[in-house]
Amino acid sequence: MAEATETALACIREEVERAFSSAPGAVLEAVLSRIAPADECARAAAYAAWDSIAHPLGGLGDFEDAVARIAAAQGSAEVAEFPRALAVFFSDNGVVAEGVSQSGQDVTRAVARNMCEGATSACRMAAFAGAEVVPVDVGMARGIEDARMVRANVRRGSGNIAHGPAMSRDGAVRAIEVGIAVACGLARAGVRLLAAGEMGIGNTTTSAAVAAVLIRADARSLVGRGAGLSDASLARKRDVVERAIDANSPDPADPIDVLSKVGGFDIAAMCGFYLGAAASKAPALLDGVISCTAALCAARLCPNALGYLVGTHASSEPASQELLRELGIKAPLDAGMHLGEGAGAMAYLPLLDSALRVYRDGKTFTATGMAAYEHFEAGK
């Protein structure tokens, strides 16, 4: 993988230390106050720049929208080459005790080791896309000793949501603040395009529970097979999600309550990551269903944060399309992916880079001596 630079790691660790030395909620409150709406003038200027390029109007479809979103997020239609990074949040979920996954928490630890070595699928894809990778322990049941892992553990694994809350409210806030710290640290180090991924056995169960509560949907319809389940195991997983919601009675109007009762430390940290990106005016690429669940939590805490998020792909998990609709964000890729770790965002990056090459270097209608296309309303 493209390992995080010492500068980036130092900045992240300083921000994490600052967060842990503050009272729970202080960092979150400060960041929420800094998030302004995305720059609509920059968005309009980006669309105007696209229209000036000698190609059919809107010819690159969703990629033109993505570049315009990036322009709005950074506050300028001059979208230069940007350093990019993928932060991957590791956490264990107590709900695995209910048999909702075919593997246990030892796999989280094994993947953490492999990621530090640059040996996971997402690491290979990030290297191809030119992105640094930052592994973060926010809630692993058993940590690993590796200098490349950011240690920001809030608690050694979450509780079993089938029988009680995943964590305390302060624990959820702390995890959100870890994500804020990571995003702000990367931005301080000069990273201008951010992405987040996750790894934690059982997190498609927790994300389905959080999503079901926030969008007030039938929980069973949002539960998928995760890393692979038999029909019987899928039925059990659906029952577990329903039981978790019934047992904890999370408040749909309070995202932190929902995260603390039926979520996970990884989802909470990713929520904070998107808030930190928005506060830093750095566009953030979404990933799959767990990422979108975290993004919805961020948007419910601060609607302005939505303007800094860029969709990449639709996961094969059932909740994915529902979450994207709720966010109002397009996902250009629909490849049936469900890998996690930020892999979908990394698959999208080279395609985005190719569109950006056209945006920056494409010849204009004026330069080619061609008449520019005009916009017409439908029916005219």
Task: Give the positions of each predicted feature.
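N-terminal loops that bind phosphate or other acidic moieties
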Residues: 2-380
